[in-house]
């Protein structure tokens, strides 16, 4: 482990929760002057931290613990029947790793995705500046995985490649291709990629029991949840 005790953290003032509107949220951030070291990041991911843009953070709410960090142990994952169908349905896609960059092709897909799937969220309306600040960061461990069908961009999975696993930062995809279940396929592909690179887990961010948008995360079994500072397996 790195010397985490030497790190500084800052908590925000309470603000509206983007997942549970009736709750007030507080977020704990790693000191932004701290260099984004991949080993520090990996250790903090074990403690439930996530990356957004140039910041590492985790919920630090006074009266709520609904946001539960979740990860899939890659070597123990077994796809169910529906997931095997999704893998088969998308076997015609090719996946290529690219460095983070702003491209109109990326942004147009991102824009359509946000406008179609998340028009009620705090990322709407999408803008080029928002896209760049959120996703296009010059970090050596960050990758854009492009999913293409005969050259056509179908999805982009933004991932951080850490010593202890793949951290799924964000995925956006073609909103008119419901039959393919591209979001779910991207997670299945990341599990396969983690195995290929001998990585322990795929970090999915936070699972919230009472948030329907988060339900998909517990469809991948077994899954591990960080409860009382311990990773607990949910089979």
Curated annotation (Swiss-Prot):
It is found in: Cytoplasm. It catalyses: N-terminal L-glutamyl-[protein] + L-leucyl-tRNA(Leu) = N-terminal L-leucyl-L-glutamyl-[protein] + tRNA(Leu) + H(+); N-terminal L-aspartyl-[protein] + L-leucyl-tRNA(Leu) = N-terminal L-leucyl-L-aspartyl-[protein] + tRNA(Leu) + H(+). InterPro entries: Acyl_CoA_acyltransferase, Asp_Glu_LeuTrfase, N-end_Aminoacyl_Trfase, N-end_Aminoacyl_Trfase_C, N-end_Aminoacyl_Trfase_N. The keyword 4Fe-4S does not apply. GO terms for cellular component: cytoplasm. Keywords: Acyltransferase, Cytoplasm, Transferase. Its EC number is 2.3.2.29. One of its GO terms (molecular function) is arginyl-tRNA--protein transferase activity. GO terms for biological process: ubiquitin-dependent protein catabolic process via the N-end rule pathway. PANTHER family: ARGININE-TRNA-PROTEIN TRANSFERASE 1, ARGINYL-TRNA--PROTEIN TRANSFERASE 1. Belongs to the R-transferase family. Bpt subfamily. HAMAP family: Bpt (MF_00689). Functions in the N-end rule pathway of protein degradation where it conjugates Leu from its aminoacyl-tRNA to the N-termini of proteins containing an N-terminal aspartate or glutamate. This is Aspartate/glutamate leucyltransferase. It comes from Pseudomonas putida (strain ATCC 700007 / DSM 6899 / JCM 31910 / BCRC 17059 / LMG 24140 / F1). The gene is bpt.
């Amino acid at each position: 482990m790195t010397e985490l005790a030497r790190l500084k953290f800052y908590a925000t003032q309470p603000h509206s929760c983007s997942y549970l509107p009736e709750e007030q949220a507080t977020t704990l951030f790693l000191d932004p002057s701290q260099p984004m070291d991949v080993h520090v990041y990996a250790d903090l991911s074990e403690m439930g931290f996530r990356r957004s843009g140039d910041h590492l953070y985790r919920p630090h709410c006074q009266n709520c613990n609904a946001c539960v960090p979740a990860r899939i142990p890659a070597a123990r994952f077994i796809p169910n029947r529906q997931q095997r169908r999704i893998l088969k349905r998308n076997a015609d896609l090719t996946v290529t790793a690219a460095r983070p960059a702003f491209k109109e092709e990326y942004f147009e897909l991102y824009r359509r995705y946000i406008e179609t799937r998340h028009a009620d969220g705090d990322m709407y309306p999408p803008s080029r500046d928002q896209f760049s600040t959120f996703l296009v960061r010059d970090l050596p461990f960050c990758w854009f995985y492009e999913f293409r069908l005969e050259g056509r961009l179908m999805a982009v999975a933004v991932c951080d490649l850490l010593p202890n696993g793949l951290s799924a930062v964000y995925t956006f995809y073609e909103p008119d291709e419901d039959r393919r279940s591209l979001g779910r396929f991207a997670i299945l592909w990341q599990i396969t990629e983690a195995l290929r690179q001998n990585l322990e887990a795929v970090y999915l961010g936070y699972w919230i029991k009472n948030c329907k948008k988060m339900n998909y995360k517990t469809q991948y079994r077994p899954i591990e949840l960080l409860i009382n500072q311990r990773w607990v397996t949910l089979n």
